[in-house]
Amino acid sequence: MVLIKEFRIPLPLTVEEYKVAQLFMVATISKKNTSLGEGIEVIENKPYADGATTGFFTRKIFHLGGRLPTWLRSFAPTSLQIEEKAWNAYPYCKTSYACPLLGDRFSVSIETRYEPDSGTQDNCLNLNSEELSIREVEHIDIVNDPIDEAHYKPEEDPKIFQSVKTGRGKLQNDWMKSTKPIMCCYKVCKVEFRCWGVQNKVENFIQRVALRDTFFMGHRQIFCWIDQWFDMDMESLREFEKKTNEEMKAQFHNNNNNNSNNSNNNNNNNTQPQRSSFFSRSTDGNK
């Protein structure tokens, strides 16, 4: 059965500001993750039109490898790849994830809508009655939700950070009631992994770690990086994306060359290469 969760993420931004903020955050974090190890390849990034709907289509390949937790690596290939396709027709976006090796046994889809409210709409993405009956709603609070100490940075704490350019920041516990502007990201995430014995564990891991924790950390960063993106228009942002994608491409190929050399050295020495896990800090209890 498909596991459906709806995440609602309020932010002290306008919907128009978030359009730039999100793209800046995705490009910045993608580059950082690629420099850490296996990496992300941007295959396509182009305008699209579907009837009256227009936006940008992107296709990426995530080379996960050692970023998987130990228990998941035990039955996943070391060269695991995930393909992402996204249709961004702001303020609506649809994203899908697939794994060629797993075929139709694995699927993740995310529908997102951005609205100028604090997360009060009950069915923003128009789920049908069957979907609503199994949907779980979770509110993500970038200020008050607990954070893993290993991931905490004072400069990315909305309670401490204050923007020089906007004056926003040092958000209080009741910030959703007292802060203007405010908006909400509504994200309906559907996860399915059909594999006997581990289905529930994998589906819950994806919803909790790969999605929920990523949304929480990423949206704290979106706000606390506001002075880096606030003055950007879409033209300068596209240039930033283009430059970042070129740097990621070069870094990815460098990583491949280094990994190939390390593999040869390890084979000669009869030793096993050491791999770091991207999720290791969050999944120690599941190993």
Swiss-Prot record:
<keyword id="KW-0446">Lipid-binding</keyword>
<comment type="function">
    <text>Phosphatidylinositol transfer proteins mediate the monomeric transport of lipids by shielding a lipid from the aqueous environment and binding the lipid in a hydrophobic cavity.</text>
</comment>
<dbReference type="GO" id="GO:0031210">
    <property type="term" value="F:phosphatidylcholine binding"/>
</dbReference>
<keyword id="KW-0445">Lipid transport</keyword>
<keyword id="KW-0813">Transport</keyword>
<dbReference type="InterPro" id="IPR055261">
    <property type="entry name" value="PI_transfer_N"/>
</dbReference>
<feature type="compositionally biased region" description="Low complexity">
    <location>
        <begin position="254"/>
        <end position="270"/>
    </location>
</feature>
<dbReference type="InterPro" id="IPR001666">
    <property type="entry name" value="PI_transfer"/>
</dbReference>
<dbReference type="InterPro" id="IPR023393">
    <property type="entry name" value="START-like_dom_sf"/>
</dbReference>
<protein>
    <recommendedName>
        <fullName>Phosphatidylinositol transfer protein 5</fullName>
    </recommendedName>
</protein>
<dbReference type="Pfam" id="PF02121">
    <property type="entry name" value="IP_trans"/>
</dbReference>
<dbReference type="GO" id="GO:0035091">
    <property type="term" value="F:phosphatidylinositol binding"/>
</dbReference>
<feature type="compositionally biased region" description="Polar residues">
    <location>
        <begin position="271"/>
        <end position="287"/>
    </location>
</feature>
<comment type="similarity">
    <text>Belongs to the PtdIns transfer protein family. PI transfer class IIA subfamily.</text>
</comment>
<dbReference type="GO" id="GO:0008526">
    <property type="term" value="F:phosphatidylinositol transfer activity"/>
</dbReference>
<dbReference type="GO" id="GO:0005737">
    <property type="term" value="C:cytoplasm"/>
</dbReference>
<feature type="region of interest" description="Disordered">
    <location>
        <begin position="252"/>
        <end position="287"/>
    </location>
</feature>
<dbReference type="GO" id="GO:0008525">
    <property type="term" value="F:phosphatidylcholine transporter activity"/>
</dbReference>
